[in-house]
Amino acid sequence: MGKIIGIDLGTTNSCVSVMEGQEAVVIPNAEGKRTTPSIIAFVEGGEIKVGDPAKRQAVTNPTKTVASIKRFMGHSFSETTDEAKRVPYSVVKGDNNTPRVDIDGRLYTAQELSAMTLQKMKKTAEDYLGQTVTEAVITVPAYFNDAQRQATKEAGEIAGLKVMRIINEPTAAALAYGLDKKGIDQKIAVYDLGGGTFDISILELGDGVFEVLSTNGDTHLGGDDFDQTIIDWLADEFKAEEGIDLRLDPMSLQRIKEAAEKAKIELSSSAETEINLPYVTATASGPKHLVKKLTRAKFEQLSDTLVKRSMEPVAKALKDAGLTVKDIDEVILVGGSTRMPRIADEVEKFFGKKASKGVNPDEVVAIGAAIQGGVLSGDVKDVLLLDVTPLSLGIETMGGVMTILIESNTTIPTKKSQIFSTAADSQPTVELHVLQGARAMAVDNKTIGRFNLDGIPPAPRGVPQIEVAFDIDANGIIKVSATDKGTGKSHDIRIEASSGLTSEEIERMKKDAEANAGADKIARERVEKINEADSLIFQTETQLKELGDKITDEHKTAIEYALTELRMAHQSQDLEAIQKGLDNVNAAWKTATEAMYAQGEQGQAAQPQAETQGDDVQDVEFEEVK
């Protein structure tokens, strides 16, 4: 059995880990970094860049550089209109009311784009392990609904991965934190503020059992929102001074987005930072520059409502777990955004204790996912993970009410059924409107599926008995069935299409992803070949100068002729001509060096002979004849 890797698919950054013996190891990417920006760029020539290479060119290519795509995962287009206004790339309405990113007329789903990041993680792991990777545990925010979980699973499939388990991020963090503390019974709170989402989970740890008692969160609260407060402040200040809204120009927007993120990070360790963006825009009167000082106090004032917003789910999760702050033994901060001093201060103030510093907030989730992979493969023993469903599940009943079958924070996997009946006399069909959420009315909750149970025999209202059953697996993915108890006729659906993609679309995207991987390989090989030519041209020019008169004029002419051909091929970037040029230069060098060494050997052979003749000369006495 191959290795099951653990992937933290983040809004801002992603991370991959794998079990090596009894230790989870975070794997550095090709750029040598332990986390990879969740950024995808489409550049000229059809090449797709992922991670740091994509991030580096974002300012000059803002409309074709996609970041924070996780915020669109599993949502309908109508749910993401506000998000779409905040990004420099174009988000349009696609099939099944799904949001799609428009890149030169080609519409990409959030799943396809996330799959590109997952492919990068997969390749990173394969390069490290020296073997093909096909299985993964992927993390999601605890408060992700069914559609968002399905979308994540689909992204994994498109990337060529069999998703062995979808695991909640705070649970993964707790697993990483508590693996070496199996003998200690304790209750922990995991406060997870990432780039785009926020979760709070309360867990009980003991004897290798990790039991989630409750979870809560906000899937629209993260580091991006803190950045946005700085973006809006900068843009509003500049507009007041210059009368220009920088948010309307994609390139200017990208520049202030990057500056805002940098300022936020700097303010975690400094009391003040300067934002300096020369030539941020231009008017008829000339270029305009943006120079502003931002203090930590001002930033905390700008983001105050966001910090307070994060504490509401914390209080609710604690209440749902039936605990008070005094019952919590450890507080763990997860996610890069928890490095903001105000966050740590607020959390520590709420719980009345210092947060644990024993975990790396950027890596702990991926490590936990790798440990879960180890549990599934049998490499990690004596660990049991008991997670919960984050949102209540039910169906719409008379009057547009949501009738709950499975309450939020129920341990999964689980199954629950309830008997319902018809609302009208001789009703032949029952439509089941499956919902997920926490509101009383159906209209206020998330629709995750609809299906009909047909063929109900004519009967007065309230007589037929329809058993509705909900089944949630360990991934938090739902199956719903309805059975007419009188006839035994039943119908069930696995809520597969709640993300808006059909199985055919997923298969097509999977093939596209494989084709892209092939195209990326060709593009990489092309660059490598051009670089090889560039290197050989430089080496040849250097060696011709160094060797000088040691090479005959005839051989020097042959090398220079081949070198000229290679230079022309390098300029044209014709790979076939480059390969021919490389072969010709190498062949000319081979002939020249063979002749050079042969000449050297002849010289060495003549030298011993002369030395031998000298050794045979002896001194003799002679008499001068007069």
UniProtKB/Swiss-Prot annotation:
Keywords: ATP-binding, Chaperone, Nucleotide-binding, Phosphoprotein, Stress response. Residues 598-612 have a biased composition (Low complexity). The keyword Transcription regulation does not apply. The modification Phosphothreonine is found at residue 197. One of its GO terms (molecular function) is ATP-dependent protein folding chaperone. Residues 598-626 are annotated as: Disordered. Residues 613-626 have a biased composition (Acidic residues). CDD domains: ASKHA_NBD_HSP70_DnaK-like (cd10234). Induction: By stress conditions e.g. heat shock. Pfam families: HSP70. InterPro entries: ATPase_NBD (IPR043129), Chaperone_DnaK (IPR012725), Heat_shock_70_CS (IPR018181), HSP70_C_sf (IPR029048), HSP70_peptide-bd_sf (IPR029047), Hsp_70_fam (IPR013126). Acts as a chaperone. Belongs to the heat shock protein 70 family. This is Chaperone protein DnaK. The gene is dnaK.
